[in-house]
């Protein structure tokens, strides 16, 4: 009502005046009164007011006269803006691909152009976002190097790509398609389809009409007879087959229907030949010299100042033929020669080469070496991009994987990909990258694999060959170019510096006398209890003082023998620093060498700012280097590690203390290699060095062309290691190449966004699936043979009394499997094995005996299982054609008596016995009966009577008594003796055993009630059914092996896809959504980073705060963020952990094995404050006080963080978040400064 009062009502009609008519008297005169209001009343205040009817008032205001409403005001009408017209835009047209091109016609001899002709172009409508073909047009120039996460990769080599020719071939062979079995019933995107199977009985299959019969000459005289036969004779759909009995085969054309002369002799069909064994890995003989090398290659693409070795020449010959090679050679054998020739060959062919390495340090070193040799070389790492247009590009394997997934146009011109240090595929964290790259490489790219010697090089090459469908030539070296001598050193003072004992000579002979001499030297020192001759507790490694004495005596001995420089491998960063600092009293360089070192340090450190040059680590390392000492591990600043490497390569560093990473690929040979210990911590436990690890590090000893032999020394600070451990470490086989393939969310999303590629195909082609997939061709052939064999079998009769024959067969099979399962669980249990003591009566069932009673004589154990020496009843061996006289055998047709219980074997003639060694699987049942036997005496007597001399001797009374007791039990219990109940007697509470027992009793009842066993035709029909069912079972097994369901990682794949679907990265049909495309752009922690971005957890923070929080995702050293953080960072850390916890809970809900605590535990926020202050501009010299983390690890964390910021910047642009993208760009800029991002010395 209040709203109505505020409305401005329209003016009244002028004729609608407030007048009233009043009759005056009775004369008929009327007067008009202008007094408004209600009729006059005697009430003092008139009638009370009343509210008007709302419906009538609303109709009057809004429906009768709506013109007063603001809606109809002209000021609220649509406005029109004058646009700027451009008539010339009408003439613009979108460029369409040119459907044809001009091709020059040249003279075949001279090459002169004779004319031009127009040729049609194919695939002109392809693009990088719709096609995987190499024929698609290149993308923008700005994306030619790195590609784009929205682009498709190129089609991987080795996968079946349908071509136009294949499509035409399929159309021509269309009649070979089975329209009843080969048609799909589930539409794309649907979970269920339509079942077109007939409900009742299948319709009869129409037979083929013989055209030759229609073309037979007509017999005009016998037309009436033919008509009669057509009307009522046997000719028709159900006519009997032709006399020849050969089935009619569909012909592809009428030309095939020619009359052929009947063969007079019917030849028996030959058995099908097995398919030829495919040999993808071809070993190359490197023992014989290549005499015609220069005749085969008169003008090699590259020449060296030395004569290549035989294995290098063999590899070069195959490179000239564009073959793929796998070079497995010893350390320092010269594998780089093969890579150099491939680079030169690519430059000659005007193509490109990519050289991949496992670590960035090796990439930088190879960039310097190859640039000095070839010049046209580029470098692509996470933070450096030099000469990307070069013919040879050096990069890490992760960058090549990113280029492959992003469809980089560099792949088009690629001829060679060189994988250095392929044995790094065994790395649990990064080994999957090698497999991904090898699978995704296109077909036109040839592969060069360089590796240390591995025992399964042929197997690995066979996998790659089958993967790429091309032969891989395996070239291995026979021996090292510089042989090694291995010693034990037990000295620890100047008096004992000569205690160096040869253990393994250069010919590979192990010297036990050297080992015993080292043991005696240690024992002699212990017996004297002299302080100067060693530690009081020789079983321990000792402290810094003992280490100092050991190294002083060792280095004095090596200087006397002129065996410097030396690399000391120590498996701890802290011990490396301690040992080097303890030798500061040594001075191993001359004055000229000191001057050279000083000038080199000044030139290298001049790149740093003043405060960075005064870092404690820089000053300490400079002092060590001037004395000829060096330290190399991950805690050292990158620029200092490069200085140490360069000085070591010049021979100015005499003693280098290094961790295991120094041996990986970096070509830094020394005269001597020393092992501080033979034990290391692998991240979980302490263990001995593996043979492959030892060989890799020991291979740094011996400089080719300078040293006749290399020296390897193992320090014995405490006790001398066991001889067996030393022999296994030094002479054992290196570790095999093993697959570390695992599923990652990035891999799944990158493949799901491409319809033509499937994650299952990636899993099939992984090295982990190779053992089960390498026989796929044989499985397909066996499946085809079984299909033919099944079609030729006669159907069993299952009518009448045999109606339940199929059920009886399934019941019998299930009962047998259930009984075997229960017995297997019994034999695996503790109580079951305890019951198998001497004298226990058992039922034996194996190839020699079927349900024969036996008594256990002896119980022994080997490395794998227990062995039971058992006296078993058997028949006397006779020679007869009757199968029943040849001893007990498994019945062909199982009757109920054979399935229920144990129908014991009873000798039909004279009862004999034997003593057999039984495995747990040979015991079919354990009876409750126990006999008193002398097992040792019975075994000795039986062994004696097996000799020809005593074969006719009668058995002992103990043997005869045991046999008679067994025979009496067999006759008393023909259906089997009472057995130990697995639940009541053996106390097995396993659910499977309990349920199996119940199911077995149910199956026994069903088998007793079967009617088919009473039919006289039961045995024959059962054999037919069993043969058919066995073939079908084998076919199901082969189909399973060939299907995706046999993949080992398929359950995990479904679980990870469910995680992506729950989080909204893919939809129900598997289509990648926006969040999934953003995750594809991330290099690591893709789910966590994407969730943080979509939760808007980063946009409100400042760039330095974002960088500090993201450090928890890349930091490798665990630690606590501390209490000095600003409140914003504390809240940010908790929010990141909360998001990680939510993702972990989703993973657990979807079935993944990783717990929530393990997933959240991958985050380390120990460097949050350090990164925060660094991004705010704090000098690096002041960061040391904020954290105890080594400087090298801090630098590595900030470098990886800058890469992550760039990934987030690209993802923000993809989503359309310019504010976040600008902040990530600013964060990366704040991080990239000073010593953390100092340019590599190898690139200058």
From Swiss-Prot:
Intrachain S-S bonds: none
Listed Gene3D superfamilies: 1.10.3380.30, P-loop containing nucleotide triphosphate hydrolases
Reactions listed under catalytic activity: ATP + H2O = ADP + phosphate + H(+)
Keywords: ATP-binding, Cytoplasm, Helicase, Hydrolase, Nucleotide-binding, Nucleus, Phosphoprotein, RNA-binding
InterPro entries given in the database record: DEAD/DEAH_box_helicase_dom, Helicase_ATP-bd, Helicase_C-like, MTR4-like_stalk, MTR4_beta-barrel, P-loop_NTPase, RNA-DNA_Helicase, SKI2-like
Family: Belongs to the helicase family. SKI2 subfamily.
Primary localization class, coarse: nucleus
EC number: 3.6.4.13
Subcellular location: Nucleus; Cytoplasm
Protein name: Superkiller complex protein 2
Entry's Gene Ontology cellular component terms: nucleus; Ski complex
Function per UniProt: Helicase component of the SKI complex, a multiprotein complex that assists the RNA-degrading exosome during the mRNA decay and quality-control pathways. The SKI complex catalyzes mRNA extraction from 80S ribosomal complexes in the 3'-5' direction and channels mRNA to the cytosolic exosome for degradation. SKI-mediated extraction of mRNA from stalled ribosomes allow binding of the Pelota-HBS1L complex and subsequent ribosome disassembly by ABCE1 for ribosome recycling. In the nucleus, the SKI complex associates with transcriptionally active genes in a manner dependent on PAF1 complex (PAF1C).
Modification Phosphoserine, positions: 242, 253
Stretches for region Disordered: 218-249
Chain positions of motif DEVH box: 420-423
Helicase C-terminal domain ranges (all copies): 582-752
Subunit details: Component of the SKI complex which consists of SKIC2, SKIC3 and SKIC8. Interacts with HBS1L isoform 2.
Ranges for domain Helicase ATP-binding: 316-472
């Amino acid at each position: 009502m209040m709203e109505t009062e505020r409305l401005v009502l329209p003016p009244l009609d002028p004729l609608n005046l407030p007048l009233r008519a009043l009759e005056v008297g009775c004369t008929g005169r009327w007067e008009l009164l202008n007094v408004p209001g209600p009729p006059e009343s005697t009430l003092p205040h008139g009638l009370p007011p009343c509210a008007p009817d709302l419906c009538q008032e609303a109709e009057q205001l809004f429906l009768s006269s709506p013109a007063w409403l603001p809606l109809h005001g002209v000021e609220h009408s649509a406005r029109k803006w004058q646009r700027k017209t451009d008539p010339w835009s009408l003439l613009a047209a979108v460029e369409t691909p040119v459907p044809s091109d001009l091709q020059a016609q040249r003279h075949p001899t001279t090459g002169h152009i004779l004319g031009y002709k127009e040729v049609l172009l194919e695939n002109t409508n392809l693009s990088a976002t719709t096609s995987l073909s190499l024929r698609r047009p290149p993308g923008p120039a700005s994306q030619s190097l790195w590609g784009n996460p929205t682009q498709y990769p190129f089609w991987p080599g080795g996968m079946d790509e349908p071509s136009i020719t294949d499509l035409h071939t399929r159309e021509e062979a269309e009649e070979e398609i089975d329209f009843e079995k080969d048609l799909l019933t589930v539409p794309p995107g649907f979970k269920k389809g339509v079942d077109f199977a007939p409900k009742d009985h299948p319709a009869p299959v129409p037979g083929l009409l013989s055209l030759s019969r229609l073309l037979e000459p007509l017999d005009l005289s016998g037309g009436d007879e033919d008509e009669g036969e057509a009307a009522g004779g046997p000719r028709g759909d159900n006519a009997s087959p032709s006399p020849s009995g050969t089935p009619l085969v569909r012909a592809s054309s009428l030309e095939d229907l020619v009359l052929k002369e009947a063969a007079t002799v019917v030849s028996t069909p030959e058995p099908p030949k097995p398919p030829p064994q495919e040999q993808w890995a071809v070993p190359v003989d490197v023992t014989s010299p290549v005499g015609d090398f220069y005749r085969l290659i008169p003008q090699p693409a590259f020449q060296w100042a030395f004569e290549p070795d035989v294995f290098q020449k063999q590899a070069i010959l195959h490179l000239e033929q564009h073959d793929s090679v796998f070079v497995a050679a010893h350390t320092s054998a010269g594998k780089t020669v093969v890579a150099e020739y491939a680079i030169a060959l690519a430059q000659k062919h005007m193509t490109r080469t990519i050289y991949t390495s496992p670590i960035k340090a090796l990439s930088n070193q190879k960039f310097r070496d190859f640039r000095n040799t070839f010049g046209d070389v580029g470098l692509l790492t996470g933070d450096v991009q030099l000469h990307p247009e070069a013919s040879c590009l050096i990069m890490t394997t992760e960058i090549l994987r990113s280029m492959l997934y992003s469809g980089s146009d560099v792949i088009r011109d690629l001829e060679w990909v060189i994988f250095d240090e392929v044995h790094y595929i065994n790395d649990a964290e990064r080994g999957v990258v090698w497999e991904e790259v090898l699978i995704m490489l296109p077909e036109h790219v040839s592969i060069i694999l360089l590796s240390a010697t591995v025992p399964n090089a042929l197997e690995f090459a066979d996998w790659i060959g089958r993967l790429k469908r091309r032969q891989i030539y395996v070239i291995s070296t026979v021996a090292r170019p510089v042989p090694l001598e291995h010693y034990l050193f037990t000295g620890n003072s100047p008096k004992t510096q000569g205690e160096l004992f040869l253990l393994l000579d250069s010919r590979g002979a192990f010297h036990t006398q050297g080992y015993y001499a080292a043991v005696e030297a240690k024992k002699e020192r212990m017996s004297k209890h002299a302080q100067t001759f060693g530690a009081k507790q020789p079983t321990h490694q000792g402290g810094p003082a003992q280490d100092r004495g050991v190294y002083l005596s060792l280095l004095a001995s090596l200087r006397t023998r002129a065996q410097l420089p030396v690399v000391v491998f120590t498996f701890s960063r802290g011990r490396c620093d301690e040992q080097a600092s303890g030798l500061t009293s040594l001075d191993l360089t001359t004055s000229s060498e000191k001057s050279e070192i000083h000038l080199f340090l000044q030139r290298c450190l001049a790149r740093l700012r003043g405060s960075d040059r005064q870092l404690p680590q820089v000053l300490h390392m400079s002092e060590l280097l001037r004395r000829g000492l060096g330290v190399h591990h991950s805690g050292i600043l990158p620029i200092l590690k490069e200085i140490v490497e360069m000085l070591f390569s010049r021979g100015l560093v005499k003693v280098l203390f290094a961790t295991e990473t120094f041996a990986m690929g970096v070509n830094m040979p020394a005269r001597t290699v020393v092992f501080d210990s033979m034990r290391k911590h692998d991240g979980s436990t302490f263990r001995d060095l593996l043979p492959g690890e030892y060989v890799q590090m020991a291979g740094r000893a011996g400089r080719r062309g300078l040293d006749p032999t290399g020296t390897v020394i193992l320090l014995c600070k405490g006790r001398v290691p066991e001889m067996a451990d030393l022999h296994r470490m030094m002479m054992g086989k290196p570790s095999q190449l093993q697959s570390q393939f695992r599923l990652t969310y990035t891999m799944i999303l990158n493949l799901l966004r491409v319809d033509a590629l499937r994650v299952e195909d990636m899993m099939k082609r992984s090295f982990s699936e190779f053992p089960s997939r390498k026989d796929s061709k044989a499985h397909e052939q066996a499946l085809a043979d079984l299909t033919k064999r099944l079609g030729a079998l006669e159907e069993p009769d299952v009518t009448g009394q045999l109606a339940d024959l199929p059920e009886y067969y399934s019941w019998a099979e299930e009962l047998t499997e259930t009984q075997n399962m229960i017995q297997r669980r019994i034999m695996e249990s503790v109580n079951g094995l305890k019951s198998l003591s001497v004298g226990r009566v058992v039922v034996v069932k194996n190839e020699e005996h079927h349900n024969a009673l036996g008594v256990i004589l002896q119980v022994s154990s080997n490395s794998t299982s227990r062995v039971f020496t058992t006296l078993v009843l058997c028949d006397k061996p006779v020679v007869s054609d009757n199968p029943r006289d040849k001893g007990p055998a498994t019945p062909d047709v199982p009757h109920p008596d054979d399935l229920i219980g144990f129908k014991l074997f009873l000798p039909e003639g004279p009862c004999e016995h034997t003593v057999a060694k039984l495995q747990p699987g040979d015991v079919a049942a354990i009876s409750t009966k126990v006999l008193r036997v002398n097992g040792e005496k019975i075994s000795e007597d039986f062994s004696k009577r097996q000799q020809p001399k005593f074969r006719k001797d009668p058995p002992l009374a103990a043997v005869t008594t045991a046999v008679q007791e067994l025979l009496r039990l067999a006759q008393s219990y023909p259906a089997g003796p009472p057995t130990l109940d697995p639940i009541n007697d053996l106390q097995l509470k396993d659910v499977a055993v309990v349920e199996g027992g119940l199911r077995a009793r149910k199956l026994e009842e069903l088998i007793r009630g079967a009617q088919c066993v009473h039919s006289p035709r039961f045995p024959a029909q059962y054999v037919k059914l069993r043969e058919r069912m066995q073939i079908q079972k084998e076919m199901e097994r082969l189909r399973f092996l060939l299907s995706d369901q046999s993949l080992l990682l398929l359950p995990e794949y479904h679980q990870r896809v469910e995680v992506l679907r729950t989080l909204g990265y893919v939809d129900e049909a598997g289509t990648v959504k926006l969040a999934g495309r953003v995750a594809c752009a991330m290099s690591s922690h893709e789910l966590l980073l994407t969730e943080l971005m979509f939760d808007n957890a980063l946009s409100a923070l400042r760039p330095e705060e974002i960088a500090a929080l993201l450090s928890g995702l890349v930091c490798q050293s665990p630690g606590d963020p501390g209490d000095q953080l600003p409140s914003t960072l504390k809240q940010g850390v908790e929010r990141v952990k909360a998001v990680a916890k939510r993702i972990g809970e989703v993973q657990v809900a979807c079935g993944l094995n990783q717990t929530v605590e393990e997933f959240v535990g991958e985050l380390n926020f120990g460097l949050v404050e350090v990164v925060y202050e660094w991004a705010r501009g704090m000098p690096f010299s002041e960061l040391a006080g904020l954290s105890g983390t080594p400087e090298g690890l801090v630098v590595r964390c900030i470098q990886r963080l800058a890469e992550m910021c760039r990934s987030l910047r690209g993802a923000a642009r993809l989503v359309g978040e310019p504010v976040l993208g600008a902040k990530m760009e600013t964060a990366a800029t704040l991080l990239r400064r000073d010593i953390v991002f100092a340019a590599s010395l190898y690139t200058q």
